[in-house]
Amino acid sequence: MNFPVTSRRQTLAGAAAIAATSLLVAEKTASAATGVGGINAIPPLAAQWGELDLAEILSRPAAYMSVSQNKSLYDAGGAQASERHRERGSLPATVKVVNAARKASNFNSFNWIGYEVFRENYPQSDFDRVQYASWTKGLNFTPEMKKQDNDLVGELRALVRPGDNEFNELALQTAFAGTQLPLELARKKIQTIVLTGIHLDWCIEGNARAARDAGYLPIVIGDACACQKPEQEAAAMERINNFFAPVISADRFVELLSKRS
């Protein structure tokens, strides 16, 4: 995949935060206002997925993965707040997915995976070094500010339970390298993986590809994910849906789970 060096981490701070009580309103209006991105970008299922019973697939031993849904992207003052994800609907859709998965007895692995934008202390190649530096160029964050930037956003922090896994991605775009995730999935005999998070065309696609190659059945919740820009989401969802994993909405996920309850 070819991405502009700065496409993942545009670092202009300043998107205004909204109250948690407005989440449901945001879900209905954020994408609808422009008709671009979010739930509007979810394509019809690719023909091959129509051969499967997705409700049955979702009834198998399953894991949930939230990737890079941190304060950096959702909260005012975050290094990536200019992308305005709080206003774009992925957060309430994610809450809907997590609440439904918690009620399903076959979901026995919940993974909250951070992605630090400040990566000066990470192992890095020459490509990594210049790319990581470009994400935070011009920012003057203290160590405490950097830590807070990578904290799980508050609405999702409230959903974390004892026994959940919290760790950071260490590779460029996947949690399947350099983390405990492969061992977690193997020990719990996971078959199906449900993905939400940011960025859709980076870590979500990267993890969906890695999951497929490792023999898992990934399903991407389109409206619980987002690209840097809404207009990038339709192409990303179409690519993922055509080649790597079914892309469905949060509402469809809830509906499919209810068929097996």
Give a label for each model feature.
Residues 25-47:
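C-terminal segment of N-terminal export signals and the immediately downstream linker at the start
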Residues 228-241:
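Active-site-proximal loop->helix
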Residues 247-261:
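A charged, well-structured terminal subsegment
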Residues 2-18:
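N-terminal secretory signal peptides and thylakoid transit peptides that target proteins
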Residues 204-214:
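Short Gly/Thr/Asp-enriched flexible loops that form oxyanion-binding sites at enzyme active sites
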Residues 194-198, 216-230:
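A short glycine-rich beta-strand->turn/loop micro-motif centered on a GG-aromatic cluster
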Residues 48-63, 95-102:
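Short amphipathic alpha-helices and their capping/turn segments at secondary-structure boundaries
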Residues 85-188:
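Active-site alpha/beta core segments
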